[in-house]
Swiss-Prot record:
Family annotation (PANTHER family): MUSTARD, ISOFORM V (PTHR23354:SF62), NUCLEOLAR PROTEIN 7/ESTROGEN RECEPTOR COACTIVATOR-RELATED (PTHR23354)
Tagged with keyword Zinc: no
Gene: oxr1
TLDc domain boundaries: 147-393
The keyword Glycosyltransferase appears for this protein: no
Pfam families noted in UniProt: TLD
Organism this protein belongs to: Emericella nidulans (strain FGSC A4 / ATCC 38163 / CBS 112.46 / NRRL 194 / M139)
Function text: May be involved in protection from oxidative damage.
Chain positions covered by the region annotation Disordered: 1-40, 63-114, 269-319
Cellular compartments annotated: Mitochondrion
Polar residues bias: start-end ranges: 279-290
Record SMART domains: TLDc
Name under which the protein is recorded: Oxidation resistance protein 1
One Gene Ontology cellular component: nucleus
Keywords for the protein's UniProt record, in alphabetical order: Mitochondrion
Length: 393
């Protein structure tokens, strides 16, 4: 019976062992194995409990020391901006909209505007002008028949030329009808030689009306030397001018005293008054009344033009006459400054159907080849300022 029982007990043991190896049922352990496994798990849990925080701290320190300090600079920049805002606005506004607007306005850098003051240094006064007869230092002789331009009138023209030329204190005679003859080609040649020596020089044209009924000298300032060309030339610095002696008022209305024939200062000033404020000054240029040089007595003064002698008249007194100077600057309507050909010289112009020698042009001043006649057209000059056309001298 015992042998029969042994095969019965051993038979179910084999499938139980095979079944546990497949993982379906837990293995059958003894007491020694259970004690060893429990002690090992306790040691592992205690080691991991202490090593994890140490590893975390060490890795954090390593990253802190090795990574670039981007976050630190950003934090410091934001802290600096906030401290700047606190200094600018020590009393914060509880309104969020106003605080946001103040932050946006303070973030923009204001533009520095310096405080400018007027300089105490002023340019010195201009040196008195000297008129020279040639390129040497010889002054123009005071003979009236050789002098069309007085120094007082030259000083008035000087105020209108470009500032760089106002500093020049001597004007030299480039061409004269008495000295060089009536030839337009000679005028061109003399101006060409002056331009070769002084490329930046300016030119003042002076023409005298010798008719008995008129006492007028007119001319122009030219930026370029006159020369024959097929088109207009010159700049906006060119201008036309005219000067005339004011007629004395009637003696019955302006005599200061009965004897001596001396006119009162008030009457002389009234004769050269500018137009009233209500007048139309659209085409009016610079208009000035200046005192001429003292006239010679009638017995000593030769028969010549009044402006050439600084406004001398036949009154026989030493009272200087009044010279009315008027300038016509560049108006900007067109660019017709100077136009010269071998047969004429013209200054200023327009584009209407009337002209002195052409049917399609108007000229401010036009001088013919023989230099014996001139004409003035209405281009940039009003009708009241026109001179008679075709006057001989």
């Amino acid at each position: 019976m015992s042998s029969a029982s042994q095969p019965d007990l051993s038979t179910p043991t084999t499938p139980a062992t095979s079944t546990s190896s497949s993982g379906t049922d837990p293995p059958h352990l003894n007491s020694n194995d259970k004690k060893s496994s429990s002690s090992t798990s306790l040691h592992q849990s205690a080691a991991s409990y202490f090593t994890y925080p140490v590893t975390h701290v060490v890795s954090g320190l390593y990253r802190r020391l090795t990574d670039p300090p981007t976050t630190n600079s950003a934090n410091s920049t934001s802290n600096n901006m906030m401290s700047r805002l606190r200094r600018q606005n020590p009393n914060p506004n509880p309104n969020p909209s106003s605080s946001s607007s103040s932050i946006s306005s303070s973030s923009q850098h204001p533009v520095f505007t310096p405080v400018r003051t007027v300089s105490p240094f002023q340019p010195p006064p201009l040196t008195p002008l000297t008129l020279l007869a040639n390129e040497e230092t010889t002054p123009i002789p005071l003979a009236p028949q050789n002098q069309l331009l007085s120094r007082a009138l030259a000083e008035e023209i000087r105020l209108l030329v470009p500032p760089r030329l106002q500093l020049v204190n001597s004007w030299r005679l480039a061409y004269s009808l008495d000295r060089d003859g009536a030839s337009l080609s000679t005028l061109y040649e003399n101006c060409r030689s002056v331009s070769a020596r002084s490329p930046r020089a300016g030119y003042v044209l002076v023409v005298r009306d010798a008719s008995p009924s008129a006492s007028t000298i007119f001319g122009a300032y030219m930026t370029d030397p006159p020369h024959p060309d097929s088109h207009y030339f010159g700049t906006g610095e060119c201008f036309l001018w005219r000067a005339s002696v004011l007629r004395p008022p009637p003696a019955s209305l302006s005599m200061a005293d009965g004897d001596g024939g001396v006119y009162s200062e008030e009457a002389l000033e009234r004769a050269g008054l500018p137009p009233p404020p209500s007048a139309d000054t659209t085409n009016v240029g610079r208009s000035t009344t200046l005192r001429g040089e003292k006239a010679q007595p009638k017995s000593l003064a030769p028969h010549t033009h009044g402006l050439a002698q600084g406004g001398a008249t036949n009154s026989g007194t030493t009272t200087p006459d009044r010279i009315r100077f008027k300038a016509f600057p560049y108006s900007g309507v067109n660019d017709y400054m100077m136009f010269c050909e071998t047969g004429f010289l013209s200054l200023g112009g327009g584009s209407t159907v009337l002209g002195f020698t052409s049917a399609h042009h108007r000229f401010g001043y036009l001088i013919s080849n023989a230099l014996g006649r001139y004409g003035e057209m209405e281009a940039n000059i009003s009708k009241d300022d026109m001179l008679p056309r075709g006057i001989h001298y």
